[in-house]
Each structure stands twice: as structure tokens, then as C-alpha cells.
Amino acid sequence: MASGILVNIKEEVTCPICLELLTEPLSLHCGHSFCQACITANHKKSMLYKEGERSCPVCRISYQPENIRPNRHVANIVEKLREVKLSPEEGQKVDHCARHGEKLLLFCQEDRKVICWLCERSQEHRGHHTFLMEEVAQEYHVKLQTALEMLRQKQQEAEKLEADIREEKASWKIQIDCDKTNVLADFEQLREILDWEESNELQNLEKEEEDILKSLTKSETEMVQQTQYMRELISDLEHRLQGSMMELLQGVDGIIKRIENMTLKKPKTFPKNQRRVFRAPDLKGILDMFRELTDVRRYWVDVTLAPNNISHAVIAEDKRQVSSPNPQIMCRARGTLFQSLKNFIYCTGVLGSQSITSGKHYWEVDVSKKSAWILGVCAGFQPDAMYNIEQNENYQPKYGYWVIGLQEGVKYNVFQDGSSHTPFAPFIVPLSVIICPDRVGVFVDYEACTVSFFNITNHGFLIYKFSQCSFSKPVFPYLNPRKCTVPMTLCSPSS
């Protein structure tokens, strides 16, 4: 009965705007009362839409500001009502022991629970240290106040971590988007050359973005949940600290355990200095190389082969293709002239018909599917040397050979002058070739004394360059198919 009356009174002194108990109540001449802050805010809102018109938010009857008056009577009722927070039934439930029905007056230090005098004498609490609630309330008030300050500090840290993770997420998105833009821009000039590299790098960046942003999004969600948990815990503590002594101590063990068990989880981050940084494959270098190849191709000459009595290579009718005959057949046909296959291999070299005595000259040779070859420039054969010189002995710049070659299908070499200890044997230097060339470009700058070799298959990558060549006499294009019977072909300028 009394509880119902209190409910009715509460409804009468509740603000129709904020639906809370009236604060500094003001009444209009129509009889409706509102919180001072609520009716003031409503008045300002009304002025924005209907100039000069003010009406009651409940009944819409117009009023003038001078007709608003403080309602002291309602304010007193609200003040009294605030003191009556619980109904007798609810008070009975909270203030009395649920097991024994006795009033809760004691606090068990070991179990950190509010108990009655019968609980104190029960087996559950026998031997425990118990105190009157008034004796421990201040101690726990200090503890909870300290915990509240600690939680507020951690909340600030959590909010900062949450902001940092959002900032890092945005930073990653911007940085990776920027990388995408750079990749697209860098590859634009070399689209035909770098289609594969572009696609590969973009896929890596997409995967990196997906993995990192997915992880950061998960971390962000965890940080939001962590922050929300702290807010709820802080709200609980604030409610206890602002409430009665009973509310402060009721269930305090649970909340203290929650505080003690709570740890601030920091999000997983990705140090930018450890990430896989995109590195374009030296786009400027490739562009310069591509331009260099374009430049030297301006000096392309139509080279043909010159048959001679020294070489036993097979030259096609168009004089553009040379191949090695079957060595065993040739040896049987020549009888004792060739004592070994090594001597025979030396005799498969041929010269181009054009002599080079000045200027710049360029040509390309198709060596696809060959397992062995030698090509470059030569100052001319030594007619009497073919019978007594070993396979590679002749291929030295000092003997007029500036050449590179392939052996056993995978070994690319450049032939340089032998050392002072082995003057009759060339110094064979391995070449690092990432993509095996099916087509090789040769460029001779006679005045600059250089011979350059380009991997046309790898977009004109420079294979090797001879510098300070001693061109004391005319030089000729040189091709040697070696013992591989697959032909070598001189490419026409229009190919």
C-alpha cells in the first residue's frame, strides 16, 4: 500500500521532459512543473523554430517568462522522496540476512561479506574476524576510492591505446594506399615490361593490408570491449561510493576480485620498421637500361656470315644461321686430322662478313634452345692455330677475342686474359644471369673501345661490358655454335 503511494507521488514530481525527479522545479500557470534546466532548454529550442512563441511542452498552452515561478512545495516533496529510496519490502530484502532474517550489522574480513549475528556463529564464519560495518566502512571506502582512481588512470590509458590503434589503422591504410599509388605510377611507363612484377607487388600489398588491418580491427574490437568493461566497473564503483554504507559493502568481494583480476591488455601492433617494404625493381635503372637498348638499336646493322675454309660449321644459304655438324661424323670424315673433340669444337667459329673499323654497330643473335655457344667480336682467325690450340685457349682479348659464352646449358662465362702465371689459358669469369637469354644483343663502339652484351629476353639487361678494348685492326662479329647442333641465328633489324 505504502509502496503504491510512493510510486504515485514519484509520478507527480517527475519532470515530463527528462523523466527524472524534478531538480529546482519551476511551474507554469497551467500547473505543470519542470526542471529549471529542462524548461530553459525547451524555451531556447522553441525560440529557434517559432520566434517569440512559448508553450507548455505538455498541454501546449502559451506562457510568458514572467509567469514562471519556483515551486517550493514540489521541491520539498522531491527532497523527502529522495530520502525514501526503497520500499519496506525491498528494504527488508537488503537490510536483513536472506538465510536467517536477522538484520545485517557485521562484516566478515575473511569472506568480505556483510553478515548477521547468526551467520557469525555459524560453521561457515566460525573463527573469522568480524567487525561492525561502521568499523570497516571507512577502510573499504579508501580501498575502493584508490581502486577507482587506478581504474580511471587505466581507462585513460585504454582510451589512448584505443585512439592509437585507430590512428595506426588509418596510418597503415594511408601508407599502403600510397604504396599502391606509387606502384601503379612506377609501372605505368614500363607496363609491357613489368606487368608480372606489378601484379605480384599489388597482390603482396593487398595481402599485407588484409592481414594487418584484419589484425588491427580485431585489436580495436578488443580495446573497445576492454574500455567498455572498465566503464561498467567504474560506474559500479561510483554508484557504490555515492550510495549508502550497505550498498558500498554489499557484494564488495566480487567487485574487488574483478578489479584484482583485471589486467590492461595492450593491442598487437606491427612495427613499421619491420614490415616488408615495397621495393620496385630499380624502375629508374630499368628505364635507363631500356632507353640505352633503344639507343643502341639505332645502330643495328644487317650482319651476315662469311663462309671460310677454316671453320667446319654449317652455314645456311641465307648466311644468317650457323650450326655445328655432328662431331663424331666430322672426326670420322677427317680421319686423323682431329685428334679430339676439343680441337674440333674450336673449328666451329665463324665471322660476320662486315668488318668494323670505326663507329657504332649493333646486332642480335638468337640462341634459344642452345646448351652451348660463344659470341662477340673477333679480330680475325689465326689460320695456322686451329690444330694446336686447346678448346678455350684462343678466347682472350689479347688474342683479339671479346666474347661471352654458355656451357652445359646453365654456365654463362666471360673470357678474359689469363694471368701472368697462366698466360696461355683464359681467365673464365662466371656471369650472373637471372633470366637465361634466348636472344643476345651485341654493341660495339669502336672509338670508345667497348663491347657490350644485352639480354634481350630480360628487357635489355646488360650482361657484360668489355672496356678499354685494344682495337688495333678491324674486328668482325663472331659466332660459335660449339658442339650443340641447335643453330644460332642472326636476327634482321626488322625482327
Swiss-Prot record:
Keywords: Acetylation, Antiviral defense, Autophagy, Coiled coil, Cytoplasm, Immunity, Innate immunity, Metal-binding, Nucleus, Phosphoprotein, Transferase, Ubl conjugation, Ubl conjugation pathway, Zinc, Zinc-finger. A zinc finger (B box-type) spans 92-133. Its EC number is 2.3.2.27. Pathway: Protein modification; protein ubiquitination. The modification N-acetylalanine is found at A2. Residues 187-200 are annotated as: Required for interaction with GABARAP and for autophagy. It is an enzyme of class 2 (transferase). A zinc finger (RING-type) spans 15-60. Residues 283-495 form the B30.2/SPRY domain. The B box-type zinc finger domain and the coiled-coil domain contribute to the higher and low order multimerization respectively which is essential for restriction activity. The coiled coil domain is important for higher order multimerization by promoting the initial dimerization. The B30.2/SPRY domain acts as a capsid recognition domain. Polymorphisms in this domain explain the observed species-specific differences among orthologs. Can form homodimers and homotrimers. In addition to lower-order dimerization, also exhibits a higher-order multimerization and both low- and high-order multimerizations are essential for its restriction activity. Interacts with BTBD1 and BTBD2. Interacts with PSMC4, PSMC5, PSMD7 and HSPA8/HSC70. Interacts (via B30.2/SPRY domain) with HSPA1A/B. Interacts with PSMC2, MAP3K7/TAK1, TAB2 and TAB3. Interacts with SQSTM1. Interacts with TRIM6 and TRIM34. Interacts with ULK1 (phosphorylated form), GABARAP, GABARAPL1, GABARAPL2, MAP1LC3A, MAP1LC3C and BECN1. This is Tripartite motif-containing protein 5. It comes from Pygathrix nemaeus.
